[in-house]
Amino acid sequence: MDLGLDFGTTHTVVAYADRGNYPVVAFLDENDDTHDHFPTVVADDAGALVYGFTALEAARRGMPFARSFKRLLAQPRVTPDSVVHIGDRNVPLLEVLTGFFRALREALHTASSIESRLDETGGGPRTVLGVPAHANSTQRFLTLEACRRAGFEVVGMVNEPSAASFEFAHRQARSITSRRNLVIVYDLGGGTFDASLLKLEGTSHEVLDSFGVNRLGGDDFDEVLATAALRAAGRARDELAGESWAALLEECREAKEGLTPQSRRVTVEVPAAAGAGARVVTVAVDDFYDAATSLVEATTAAMEPLVRSLASPTDEGTELEGVAGIYIVGGASALPLVPRLLRARFGRRVHRSPMPSASTAVGLAIAADPSAGFSLRDRLSRGFGVFREREGGAAVSFDSVLDRSLVTSDVVAGPSSADHVVVTRRYQAAHNIGWFRFVEYSAVDDQGEPRGDLAPVADIVFPFDPELQRVHPLAEEDPAPGSVNLEGTPIIRREDGPLVEERYTVDPAGIIAVSLTDLTTGYRQEHVLHA
């Protein structure tokens, strides 16, 4: 079976390919009620980690829980050992991710609408996994690694807004013409925002550019509503302990998701705290929207580079030349404020997906379906470069290696060695030691220095001096970045350095690997780059 798996900040949605249709999987909760998602929640139930609906049931019994642990993946210095706080317990992030995907896979086999169709003896279902367009290498690696450890056969990883473009083309093919074959996917999820401009020619899709904000999503709207509820209750944020604050956020999330265009008031129960009892308060929806408008404006500011060259003012708003539509997807985009503000600016070209929370999962299922015939050329979406020592270690220079606009391989066609993008550089080393500090970044300034979101990827030490290479031989297996310890060894400039080759490979999932080779001695290091 071919699955599309949209790992969301608050909800995880799965769709599957079924003879040209792509239904969303329904999951059963503890009461055998059906839902079109699996909750992205973990709880500590008497020492055992539980996930999904079981975690929600444990949370209702007062057990400590954590929602939105996916957001930790967007932190600049995230590692497999980054900590998820579940009450007083600290659990490594990779352990939580793997446990979550394992619980999801078990639910698919035992408590879902497709349980009878999954072959338990045939290994994991063929799965295409979604990832935010601006996710760094570590986020991609950890998501992929956890999913594979849980037993899924991951055959591809597709950027979420690119996947939503497949769902748009599948559902609204008639809106795409030779004059209007551009689509802007506006993807506002629970924790991230991405906007991608795509050119659609039949089943061939190409990403022309993409921008986003790694930490902006539905969780932030929940905090705005929680702040308004506290104000209405006459309480202060510091009066609520961690678990009480988490309970209030959960209450606000449920209240927010129940809003309709006709809603005028929203009711929230503020938990007991600091000697005060629980209190039910009412917040005017207009007041909530006024406070949340700046969040929506932050998304339109982020996508401004996409629309600037296409925009022309009209009486009805901004007309976008050649654009068939701005397609609104993502669970947080269901808030009525979002399409209202976008339509006020862009007019009738704004189309909200009829299934905003499931659009990406459906698109991923289309990508997983070999018979669908879609192809995709995406962009790297974030720059990749290296800080190097110069002037005998007295200064540092920055070298951009991979531009954010780099066209990557066709991730839908399936991984093979031919699908990898390779960049090779050769030079004569000028020092006895090379210190490579690799980073990913969102932009560079006029001087070529990285700016905006900056995420360290790995520090690698490479001895250029043959004597140091003999003293520090590599292990047989691929060494971890930084495993060659030359701490305290002085950096010396030399005139007779070896010829060095740097070979960078970007796989279809967007994960970067580097091979460093001294072509004179044959000494080599190979690393898959992630923190």
Predicted regions and their residues:
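Short glycine-rich phosphate-binding loop at a beta-alpha junction
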Residues: 115-132, 312-330, 515
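Conserved phosphate-binding catalytic cores of ATP/NTP-utilizing and phosphoryl-transfer enzymes
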Residues: 1, 155-186, 358-375
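Adenine-nucleotide phosphate-binding core of ATP-dependent small-molecule kinases
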Residues: 84-106, 110, 275-309, 468, ...
